[in-house]
Amino acid sequence: MSSTHVVDTKTESQHVDSPEVEAQRHASHDNGYDLDEKAKVADYKADAVEAENAEHNMGVLEAVKAYPMATFWAFIMSFTIIMESYDVFLCNNFVALPAFKEKYGVYDPVHGYVITTAWQSALQVSGQLGALIGVFLAGPLTSRIGYRWATITGLMFLNAFILIFYFAESLPVIFVSQILEGLPWGIFIANAPAYCSEIVPIKLRAPATQMLQMFWAIGSIIVGAVTYVYNPVKGDTAFKIPIAIQWIFPTPLAILLFLAPESPWWLVRKGRLEEAATSVGRLGRKSRLNVPETVAMMRRVIEMEKDESEPGYFELFKGVDLYRTLIVCGAYAAQNLTGNLIANQAVYFFEQAGLATNTAFALGLITSALQWIFVMLSWILTTYLGRRTIYLYGSAINVVLLIALGIAGSVGNSNASTNAVAALGLIISVLFTLGPAPASWVIIGETSSIRLRPLTTGIGRASYYIVEIPLIFLSSYLLNPTGGNLGGKCGYVWGGTGLFCLVVAFFWLPEMKGRSYREIDIMFKRKIPARKWKTAVIDVQDDE
C-alpha cells in the first residue's frame, strides 16, 4: 500500500467513512464489545473509528467544552514543573545575590565577594545531576504504579529534601541538597508531558503540553520577584525566605493529584478497561462524548503496539522506536543549544553585560514576565500553524539573534554596546519561549508510542541533562570575569550550535499537528519522510 498520496482536503478534514464502515458502526452501536476484555479488535473497531473521527472533527473550543476537566488536570500536573523551574532560577540568582555571596563566597579585591566559577557551575548542575537520576527512576516507576502515584511520591520526598537545603551552612551541603531535590524533579519532568498529552483530545495536545513552558516561566517570575525584593536585605534572611517558599507547592499539589484521574491510556495498557472508562468520564462531559467508544479507540492503538513483555529501555533503541526516541531526545537536548542557557542565566548574563545588580534583577523579572505572555501566544501559533513550522521558523530567528548578540558584544564596552547586548539577551530569552521551547514540549508529548511513553519521555529528559550539565560549566566559564569573560560574544557559540539543530530538525522533524496516536504510529512504521508528513493521508481503517 502506498504510504502517501495527494491530500483531499475536504475528505481529510471531515474524515468521511465509507458505506461499509457506516454499516459496521451501526451494527455495533450498542458499544457491547468496547469494555469486554476478551473482545478482538474487529469487535470494537467501528466504535474506535467513530471516536477517532469525533476527535478529528472537534474544533478547539468544542474540545475545551467536551473535556473541561482534562484541561484542569493537565494544568495541575503541569504545575509540578514550577518546583524545578523555581529552584533552577533560584540557584542561578543566588550567585548574584549579595548576602549569599557574602556568606558562601570568597573575597576578590576587584569584584568584592564572589562565588567561584567552580562552585557556580557545581550549584547550577547539582539539581540536574539529581534529575538525571530521577528520570531513569520515573519510567519504571510510572509504568508500574501510574502517573499519579509516581508524581505524588516525588512531591512527598521533595518536602524532606527542601529541609536540607534550608538548613545548609556550606556549599557542599547545598550541593548535596540540590542533587536530592533533583530526584523528584526528574519524575515530574518525565511524567508531566506524557500525562498531559494522554488525557486531552487531539486539538488540545499543543496547549496542554505547552503549559509546561508557561509554568517554567511562572517559576522564574516568582524567583525574580522574590530575589529582587530580598536583594538589598542583609544576612541569611535574604536567601532563607526564598528557599522556604518552595514548601508552598508540594503538599497542595499532592492532595490535588490524589483526587485526579489516572491517564486512561495507562489504564488501558494495564487492561483495566472499566477504570479507563471511569477516567474518561471524569475528564470529559458524558453528554458530549461516547465513553465506551473513546476506550475502544485507545484499545485499538494499544493493540497495534502490543507486546507480551514489559516495556524496557532497550526497546527505545530498536527499529522504528529508535527514530521516535531520537526525535524526543533531540527536541530536549536542542533546548540547551539554542538559547536556553542564556534564558536560565538571564540575571547573571545581564550583570556580566555591565548592568548594575539591581538593574539586572529587575530586567530578569521583566524577562520572565514577558516569557509567560509569549508562551501563551505560542499556544495559538502551535495549535493552528503546527509544531514543525513554529519550531523551524522560531529556531531560524533565534540563530539570527544569537549571531547579532555576538556582534553587539564585539564592538567595544560603550554604553550603547552594553545596552544592545542586554536588549538582545532579553529578546532572545523571550522569543525562545514563543517558538522552539513550547513547540518542543508538544513534540516530546506526541512522538513516542503509547506503550513506551513513560520510558521515552524519561530518556529524552535524560538527554537534556546530559547535554546541559557540561554546557552549564561552559556557559559559566564563557560569562565569568575570571573565565572567558565573553559577555555578548557567547552569542557566536550558541548561534553555531543553534544552526546545527535547525538543519537537523529540517530534515528529521515530522509535523504531527492534527494526527491521532494511531496515525502517528502508522506513519512512523511506514517510514514516511519527515517533510511529507503534512500531506500524507492515513485511511481510517488502516492498522498498519
Question: How should each PLM-predicted stretch be described?
Answer:
Residues 2-281, 303-544:
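Alpha-helical transmembrane bundle of multi-pass membrane proteins
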Residues 284-286:
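ABC-type ATPase nucleotide-binding domains, specifically the catalytic core motifs of the NBD
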Residues 288-303:
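Short, well-structured alpha-helical segments
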